[in-house]
């Protein structure tokens, strides 16, 4: 049983689900449109440059979850899935998941996007488990705070190692990891088979230097 790990945004999806959720909230009038959109765009640029202050970003991104009922959030999420996510699920990404499934591998998505956004996407893609940023909940509502270590950059390695403590049959020693982003270099360096998927320029350069496989799912 080998572990096949996948980044989500711009790897299995041709969009960034976190940024798309921010756009969706603006369209719904759920947040202050111009200010939120400007901040959302800036944080995406910071992420792409490998310079994101994750805690500053999360204080903005998780706040709307604390301001609305779970019922409202779930209704929005269904609309969001239909209009913002389904059109961006890459058919070749689904084929790659199917190939690993056929091999009998354990399919794991690890993402720096929070579980509220990504839980239903992971279910839709049919993976075995999901490691995501965990928004804290109290009494059935989100608090706007984050729980535990954010699964971002080195935090992805930390969270996977914590997760592996409960998975005696699985190891990184024969694992695959697919990602598009230089932010994921730390986990790519830990696995047996790192694969750069439609990589950003910095990851493409690193992949060439390390002789890592480069793949396009588009």
Locate each region found by the language model.
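Active-site phosphate-binding/coordination module
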Residues: 17-24, 70, 133, 146, ...
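Conserved active-site and cofactor/substrate-binding residues in soluble primary-metabolism enzymes
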Residues: 16, 68, 155
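Active-site neighborhood of HAD-like aspartate-dependent phosphohydrolases
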Residues: 1-49
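Metal-dependent phosphoesterase signature
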Residues: 56-92
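Short, compositionally biased "basic patch" segments
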Residues: 43-70, 129, 134
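Amphipathic alpha-helical segments within well-ordered protein domains
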Residues: 22-23, 62, 192
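C-terminal cap/substrate-recognition subdomain and adjoining C-terminal extension
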Residues: 1-2, 75, 82-218
